[in-house]
């Protein structure tokens, strides 16, 4: 805990091309070693591929993918009487978004396609169709929360 009170949240600026803060946060998630230009290029090319393959607006497909990937529940470890319990808790809206973006980018990196643009585009398309590794990760989180529902009364 900082002594000087809570640290203020930094607000991200909306993306110049898509006018969306969510897109800026995705660019920040893709970015490695501060190379924002490269991350933007990857995302914009991926969005072009998404629009081409789906025949829809890339932004709408991405928003649908985010809805399908963002977890509602997660489990957190809580120590009670010498043993650790996995306690299911609801995920705050901002964390839901952060986790969704992280899952999409991380599982894109693990895919087998040649370029990051293709991997990201395919992961977004898969997520919008409720398939893919990122959606599976969310389902696994929900299953864990469901399995540990008995410990819900340990919430804090």
UniProtKB/Swiss-Prot annotation:
The keyword Ribonucleoprotein is annotated on this UniProt entry: yes
PROSITE patterns: RIBOSOMAL_S7 (PS00052)
Keywords of this entry: Ribonucleoprotein, Ribosomal protein, RNA-binding, rRNA-binding, tRNA-binding
Pfam families, A to Z: Ribosomal_S7
Example GO molecular function: tRNA binding
InterPro entries per UniProt: Ribosomal_uS7, Ribosomal_uS7_bac/org-type, Ribosomal_uS7_CS, Ribosomal_uS7_dom, Ribosomal_uS7_dom_sf
GO biological process: translation
One cellular-component annotation, GO: small ribosomal subunit
Domain of life, source organism: Bacteria
Record's keyword annotation contains Heme: no
HAMAP family associated with the record: Ribosomal_uS7_B
Known role: One of the primary rRNA binding proteins, it binds directly to 16S rRNA where it nucleates assembly of the head domain of the 30S subunit. Is located at the subunit interface close to the decoding center, probably blocks exit of the E-site tRNA.
Family named by the database record: Belongs to the universal ribosomal protein uS7 family.
PANTHER family assigned to the protein according to its UniProt record, in alphabetical order: RIBOSOMAL PROTEIN S7
Assembly notes: Part of the 30S ribosomal subunit. Contacts proteins S9 and S11.
UniProt-recorded name of the protein: Small ribosomal subunit protein uS7
Organism ancestry: Bacteria, Bacillati, Bacillota, Bacilli, Bacillales
Gene (name only): rpsG
């Amino acid at each position: 805990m900082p002594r000087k009170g809570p640290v203020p949240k930094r607000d991200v600026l909306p993306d110049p091309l898509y006018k969306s803060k969510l897109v800026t946060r995705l660019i920040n998630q893709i970015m490695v070693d501060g190379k924002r230009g490269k991350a933007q290029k990857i995302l914009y090319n991926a969005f072009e591929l998404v629009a081409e393959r789906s025949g829809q607006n890339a932004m709408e497909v991405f928003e649908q993918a985010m809805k399908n990937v963002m977890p509602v529940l997660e489990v957190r470890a809580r120590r009670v009487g010498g043993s650790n319990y996995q306690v299911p808790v609801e995920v705050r809206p901002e964390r839901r978004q952060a986790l969704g973006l992280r899952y999409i980018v991380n599982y894109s990196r693990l895919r087998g396609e040649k370029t990051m643009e293709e991997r990201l585009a395919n992961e977004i398309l898969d997520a919008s169709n409720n398939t893919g590794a990122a959606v599976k990760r969310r389902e696994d989180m929900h299953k864990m929360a469901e399995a540990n529902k008995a410990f819900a009364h340990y919430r804090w």
